[in-house]
């Protein structure tokens, strides 16, 4: 029997899909390269925005078209599954897996193959350990989920309702997973969490993200460690110190701000002000001068005025982000904002505001990227792009493209930057690691 998993959304969904694939292969299922070749299709969904939910339903519709022509089991997992539950069975799905029930994927598939309609939502995260089989999408970089859920309850966000409350994995279990990855030749890991900075608070044993980064950096063979996604008020001075002094910890911080207006931040239930956020950036940069800080912003939140938007523009100009993810506000059913705030900003105005910020960020990117011209940076070669060039990222998460060969993938390379754009940088390889082995990760 062959299976195919289509994944939408965040890196945690990607990690969940890797785990589901590993569990299915352990039971004798084999992966298919396309849904047309599969006996079982699983759609791992995202519900963070209306558009992502619509993509999930569109994909379900496409799979049901195939199902009408031949025998096919179709399952839905992820945040849309958790949110819509049994409604998806009514829409034609054969099984539904909640976000904390992905470890029961083989049970769901086997029961569905017998003709049963299956909906599993029970929390099985206590069974989530380093011993789980996983089919990783990369041979040198691995996602490692360290904390599930979120306790922040931002008024626009569906995640606390679909992913549940915060639940940290024991530190030793995470470290054992990283040790196994190192033995398998993995060189980079990214620690994942909806609020990764909250790691360890619920364990009550002194565990923290800062301590985890320090311990993981001692594991031989692991050269770079990343973490996603941070919440400003949970970003500790201890964490800043670790980033500053530990050469294996990436000099890259993703720190969503969402708005520059204090009034809007309060309506969003973000527990900081614009001034406090900018002060945090200053603290980070004072200790880590070469850090690359990226962020997320929502435009068109209910009641956002032109004055509020100007405050956001001011924040972006002062923050000088290396990257900025922009989203138009879309109400998510069940959230506080959906219940209590009228979505009254015209769509055309939301688009105008987003376009303005996109253009502003492009100018900032271009200016910041000029610093790279003529410099030589160290990257891990990741893959070949559609244009034929290869690419990698430096320790600040800057994408560098260059001419290369397939054997280079997974190795360190020094690239001299020759061309600057507002996006990727382009350069020439001046050194390539002969065989993958522990080397300095920064340059």
Curated annotation (Swiss-Prot):
User: What Gene Ontology molecular-function terms does this entry list?
Assistant: 4 iron, 4 sulfur cluster binding; metal ion binding; N6-isopentenyladenosine methylthiotransferase activity
Q: Where is the MTTase N-terminal domain?
A: 1-114
- Name it: tRNA-2-methylthio-N(6)-dimethylallyladenosine synthase
Subunit composition and interactions: Monomer.
Q: Which residues cross the membrane?
A: none
Binding positions ([4Fe-4S] cluster 1): 10, 46, 79
Q: Which cofactor does it need?
A: [4Fe-4S] cluster
Where is each Radical SAM core domain found? 136-367
Instruction: Please list the residue ranges annotated as the TRAM domain.
Output: 370-431
**Record text on cofactor binding:** Binds 2 [4Fe-4S] clusters. One cluster is coordinated with 3 cysteines and an exchangeable S-adenosyl-L-methionine.
The cysteines joined by S-S bonds are: none
* Compartmental location: Cytoplasm
The record's InterPro entries line, in alphabetical order, gives: Elp3/MiaA/NifB-like_rSAM, Methylthiotransferase, Methylthiotransferase_CS, Methylthiotransferase_N, Methylthiotransferase_N_sf, MiaB_methiolase, rSAM, rSAM_horseshoe
**What is the predominant subcellular site recorded for this chain?**
cytoplasm
Residues binding [4Fe-4S] cluster 2, per UniProt: 150, 154, 157
Keywords associated with the record: 4Fe-4S, Cytoplasm, Iron, Iron-sulfur, Metal-binding, S-adenosyl-L-methionine, Transferase, tRNA processing
Q: Does the keyword Iron-sulfur apply?
A: yes
Provide the function of this protein. Answer: Catalyzes the methylthiolation of N6-(dimethylallyl)adenosine (i(6)A), leading to the formation of 2-methylthio-N6-(dimethylallyl)adenosine (ms(2)i(6)A) at position 37 in tRNAs that read codons beginning with uridine.
EC number(s) per entry: 2.8.4.3
